[in-house]
Amino acid sequence: MDCRVTHFKEKDSFISKLKESDKSLLEFYQYNPVETASFTTKMKRPNNGREKQLAQIIKDYMADLKLTTSQLEHIEALEQGAKVVIGGQQAGLFGGPLYTFHKILSIVTLSSQLTKEYGETVVPVFWIAGEDHDFDEVNHTYVYNAKEAQLKKVKYHTMTPPETNVSRYTPDKEAMLNALNLFFEELKETNHSKPLYKLCVDIINEFDTWTDIFKALLHAVFKEHGVLLIDAQNDKLRQLEKPLLKQIVTNHSKINQVFRQTQEQTIASGLTQMIQTDTNVHLFLHEDGMRQLISKEDNLFKLSKSDITYSEEELIELIETEPERFSNNVVTRPVMEEWLFNTVAFIGGPSEIKYWAELNNVFKLLNVEMPIVLPRMKMTYMMERTQKLLKQYSLNVEKVIQNGIDDDKNEFVREKASDTFIQQVEELKAKHENVYQQLLNEVKENQDNFNLVTKNEEIHNKQFDYLLKRYLLNIERENDISMRQFRELDLVLHPHHGLQERIWNPLQIMNDFGIDVFSPSTFPPLEYTFDQIIIKP
């Protein structure tokens, strides 16, 4: 496999500012992510003292998996106080979307680099957001049908979607297998299809909960990299979190205050508001089979979906006796993650690293240091056919990845069309505009007639536009093979008007490139970069 790093002009000004060490942005973070000194400082930070307990919790959590030598070594290193590079994601159907795998590759790449540079093990850790309850975000994925040049949605269907954490949800195996079959029906048959299908079927049959199925797939793919996995909703992990959970409850008012103030500061500095939440407590409680947001009202802690109330003392007692019923929201989750781990760097998606800026003073209030915050690496895969089509139409791959195919397709159609016809239609439209302007001048004193002429002009202009549009559409129909090929390029390189990794599923890449495509022996060696990476066979 070939790997090419390509520099694009960054569309996201936030990422550009981060790369350029913009002071107005960095004031909301505690470390500059592009300075070597930041990593040196973080590597020297004293440990938090929770590493032995944490290593045992992860070992227990992964006990139902066959661990590799590198994973066992990383658990031992973690126990001895090794620093980590960490990132996380919700448990998407069949591991999707593709950027989930790219997050893990980013974590692996950076941890490996730091291990070499500092001569001590830095452990790659992936945090499964099993505490999340928004099932609509994880119950579907997309598959590209190359034969039809169509991108199709595949969904896990259930009449009773969970209202609690996805970690507590046990999906119907038959429905999962049905979704898997629908996915594979759309894939082209390759030498990798049958073993890949068997891998997925075996995982679905062996594991029961939604996040355990997700965990097993990630393990199968990334075990040789030594990646350690942990579910945010793990009961033993929640036991370890009790001290900070209690702090969050007792300091909920101050936490909310500094969060809102920092958010106002980020907005005033020109950043877009990322976190939308009405709560003033920033914790959830599992009650009546539902994950319910806690808020403070009239000196009582209330739940979002029931009439049950708690005093502060009762909540503290509940944390002590049943901590597994609690979970963090978007404001407290990052702080909890960093309280648990001795982290050098956190790797997240563009939206994630933006909302961490709004939490700077929450970290400080709870005396938890924010790690170095970095965006995940962006990767796009090019199949041989994609390369062939790009060459056939003399297209720039970087342009198509970033902007899509519309401009190139329209240029192609215009070249096939009659310049004379288009020019005459445009001239005719211009002549009519002149005539209508004269008519409007004649009737400007009479509002009814003025409106009549204006409306009539709109009708005629629409007809001219329709004529030109239909003419060009007929050109497209005459070149239907080329139009299909342009659509194919768009769905592969710029699906749904965005990056491939935001829509495509990892199984698609494994089916095309090989079931071991993401393993260290196959995947091209990477160095962490802000730039776009293009990967081809």
Swiss-Prot record:
Record-linked InterPro entries: Bacillithiol_biosynth_BshC, CC_BshC, Rossmann-like_BshC
Entry keyword annotation includes Transmembrane: no
Top-level taxon of the source organism: Bacteria
Parts forming coiled coils: 383-451
Keywords: Coiled coil, Ligase
Keyword flag Ligase: yes
Pfam families in UniProt: CC_BshC, Rossmann-like_BshC
E.C. code: 6.-.-.-
Main EC class the enzyme belongs to: ligase
One example GO MF annotation: ligase activity
Function field: Involved in bacillithiol (BSH) biosynthesis. May catalyze the last step of the pathway, the addition of cysteine to glucosamine malate (GlcN-Mal) to generate BSH.
UniProt family annotation: Belongs to the BshC family.
Name of the protein in its database record: Putative cysteine ligase BshC
Organism name: Staphylococcus haemolyticus (strain JCSC1435)
This protein's encoding gene: bshC
